[in-house]
Amino acid sequence: MPGSTGQPDAGGAGTGTTAGDPGHPHPALAGAEDAAPRPPPEPDDAAAALRLALDQLSALGLGGARPGDEGMATRSADGATECGEDEPAPPDELEVAVAPPVTASVAPGGLPLLDPDVSPRPSPPDVFASFAPHPAALGPSTLLAEQLNVIGSRKKSVNMTECVPVPSSEHVAEIVGRQGCKIKALRAKTNTYIKTPVRGEEPVFIVTGRKEDVEMAKREILSAEHFSLIRATRSKAGGLSGATPGPPNLPGQTTIQVRVPYRVVGLVVGPKGATIKRIQQRTHTYIVTPGRDKEPVFAVTGMPENVDRAREEIEAHITLRTGAFTDSGPDSDFHANGTDVCLDLLGAAASLWAKAPHPGRRPPAATGGLRGDNALGAASTPEPFYVGSRGGPPLPDPSPSSPYGGSGNGGFTFGGDGPSAPTGTATPEDCDFGFDFLALDLTVPATATIWAPFERAAPLPAFSGCPAVNGAPAQPNTGTRRSSGGGAATTPRHSPTLPEPGGLSLELPLARRSVPDPVGAVPWRPPQSALPPFSGSTTFSTTPSLPSTTLASSTLDTVPSEGNHKPSTTAANSSASTAAPGPPSAALARECVVCSEGEAMAALVPCGHNLFCMDCAVRICGKSEPECPACRTPATQAIHIFS
């Protein structure tokens, strides 16, 4: 172009070129003509226009197709920035700078995006190949066949029917329940229909439902059968006087009898049977309660270990509520371990607790000398309750004899000093009896015992046959114990003698215990007239008092001799005859051994020592480590004794 080759200066060349060649057919001249009268664009406007064009090109996918135009546009933008205001842009450069945006915005031309050669359009099957076909495309036959199979299988399982026979109509009544409550619950639980047999028909249940539901209902009916068997046997047995036959066809289960006193049957059953039901649920057993006109025997059925647990819970409940222990039969644990049931609680009702002697136990005559049964001329029935210890009338026959009430003196003679006491030496097993805790533990300091207020400076006249108590030197213990009598003078005695011309008697509360525990001292009750009441003074010069642990130098088992000090049996018998039992009076009320103020009316469980007032017993049980002050046995509860 001639206008663009020779331009003497920027202003004149630009003007002359545009005016001298107005009709130039090239489209660039028209653009230059339009741009000539306008002022040169600012650098910011040019950059913005270029950025807009690049955005449009990139949106249309043409950014990579024309890299040369982009470079030229960039260079023209740089040149326009360098020109400034004094030197307008040349027409050629202006044409190059403006041409791409005009071309892009006005005439985009053929779009390469729609060109099949550049990017071919994918077919629809390729796009939706990853999706599963619509179920309708599979045809109605497949769906219909599947639904028919499901319905057919369900229809087959619903039509399951099975007959469940039971032995008798008593079982039907037990399984159906009162007003059908049990069978309704079983229907709802198993989702089945159970047809109960009509009275007079065969006792067969008809169960309809799915197979697994029918099996579950059958198991439920048969699992409840053993309870109904027991009830049916009970109704036909005619009472519990003999051995109650156990339920048949129940392998591994056993039935035992738990005999209790008449007066505690209602206590074991509880209000509306709540107690016995709780024991049944806790031990997984079935317990048949005795009728009002039957023997007081509970029939417990279940697995052997569960039956034993139920028996223990029944005995524990009686012990907890009454403070007394049960010896339910000859196979009782308390028979086997040789301990006594010796709580002074039940009064004349103690005859209910008597029992036949166990054939496997040692003969009771061997222990009569130490316990005083033979010495008092009474029958040798083991393990009675000693209810005559409060001076009450002796028990009528055939109640078990009591060494406290059998001789009529309301007291007890240690060591069997009566005329019928056997002489000689007995084995330690024969000498084992309910007073093992009389072995005194003299190693306990005086401040650690509750008997410190009753210490004496003078020797105790009542223990004249015990040189160890009176301060005489004691010989080492030979390890044997004698039963009674004047023979074998050098044999150490197990317990002290208490003869007194005025009729010395005492009351010694006994307790069941597992092992003989040594104690700091033993509470003895003074006689009605021989000993004064305890006032807390520590010196008694003329009257006998309680023994103190600080007076003796060794245990009472180490007494060397008693030939000169032992009184005659005549004196013992005369003392027995002078203190005949009379009606209980206020003078017989015992004082609490802890506070010496309140009346002893509370006992500790499980040892059974009734030596405390209620306040002291509650205070003992409230300690962090509660224990009985007399036997050091852990105490679990304090009970109030009404005698």
Curated annotation (Swiss-Prot):
One of its GO terms (molecular function) is mRNA 3'-UTR AU-rich region binding. It holds the Pfam family KH_1. Residues 160-221, 253-314 form the KH domain. Coiled coil: none annotated. This is RNA-binding protein MEX3D. One of its GO terms (cellular component) is perinuclear region of cytoplasm. Residues 1-48, 61-92, 357-427, 471-505, 519-583 are annotated as: Disordered. Residues 405-418 have a biased composition (Gly residues). CDD domains: KH-I_MEX3_rpt1, KH-I_MEX3_rpt2, RING-HC_MEX3. InterPro entries: KH-I_MEX3_rpt1, KH-I_MEX3_rpt2, KH_dom, KH_dom_type_1, KH_dom_type_1_sf, MEX3, Znf_RING, Znf_RING/FYVE/PHD. RNA binding protein, may be involved in post-transcriptional regulatory mechanisms. The modification Phosphoserine is found at residue 495. It is found in: Cytoplasm; Nucleus. Binds RNA through its KH domains. Residues 83-92 have a biased composition (Acidic residues). A zinc finger (RING-type) spans 592-632. Signal peptide: none annotated. GO terms for biological process: mRNA catabolic process; mRNA destabilization; RNA destabilization. Residues 18-34, 495-505, 531-556, 567-583 have a biased composition (Low complexity). Keywords: Cytoplasm, Metal-binding, Nucleus, Phosphoprotein, Repeat, RNA-binding, Zinc, Zinc-finger. The modification Phosphothreonine is found at residue 491.
